[in-house]
């Protein structure tokens, strides 16, 4: 089936383990079990529809921004497995930096037990600021670095960890697993 509508919200973001994807929500009618694509007026795919997002937002058809899942899809098509790090993270916004003195980077909101990050010593509350020589400011930076690596690769991960009255910089060596 083909439906027409407008993008109702383009500002959402959904975070998962080792990933975060931009969301698009539209006012298009949908079938609860349907999958597909949202295209612009030029016929270009701009989102991959998922019922996971759609069902959470009443009658809004939702999907992951195509730009965010492109590398994942290309890797799957080429038979390349996804490297596994094992964290959930969220970017530190500028208000938190300015008002609370929290360093810029990717805040680790959860670490999966038994994951490469867990085994290396990374903890919930750490702020990832660099991987190897690349500055990490958000989940996109993190995913770019992870998508370019293979399982078994060793990454030098720099975090800032809260101590009594400051943040200490710690470097961990994380050996990536396979998802």
Predicted regions and their residues:
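Active-site region of chymotrypsin-like
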Residues: 2-62, 102-109
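PDZ-domain C-terminal substructure recognizer with occasional recognition of PDZ-binding tails
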Residues: 74-84, 88, 94-96, 129-131, ...
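C-terminal cap/linker of serine protease catalytic domains
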Residues: 45-103, 166-167
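Beta-strand/loop subdomains of soluble extracytoplasmic proteins
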Residues: 1-13, 21-22, 67-72, 83, ...
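Conserved PDZ fold ligand-binding element
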Residues: 42-46, 117-139
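A short glycine-leucine-enriched loop at secondary-structure breakpoints
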Residues: 35-38, 99-102, 116-127, 148-150
């Amino acid at each position: 089936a083909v439906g027409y509508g407008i993008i109702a919200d383009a500002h959402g973001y959904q975070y998962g383990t080792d990933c975060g994807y931009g969301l698009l929500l539209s006012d298009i009618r949908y079938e609860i079990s349907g999958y597909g694509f949202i295209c612009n007026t030029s016929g270009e795919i701009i989102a991959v529809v998922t019922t996971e997002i759609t069902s959470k937002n009443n009658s809004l058809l939702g999907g992951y921004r195509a730009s965010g899942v492109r590398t994942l899809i290309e890797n799957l098509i080429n038979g390349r497995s996804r490297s596994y790090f094992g964290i959930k993270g969220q970017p530190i916004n500028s208000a938190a930096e300015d008002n609370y003195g929290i360093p810029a980077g990717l805040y680790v909101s959860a670490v999966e037990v038994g994951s490469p990050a867990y085994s290396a010593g990374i903890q919930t509350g750490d702020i990832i600021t660099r991987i190897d020589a690349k500055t990490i400011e958000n989940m996109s930076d993190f995913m770019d670095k992870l998508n370019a690596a293979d399982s078994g690769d060793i990454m030098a991960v720099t975090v800032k960890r809260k101590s009594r009255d400051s943040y200490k910089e710690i470097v961990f060596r994380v050996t990536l697993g396979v998802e």
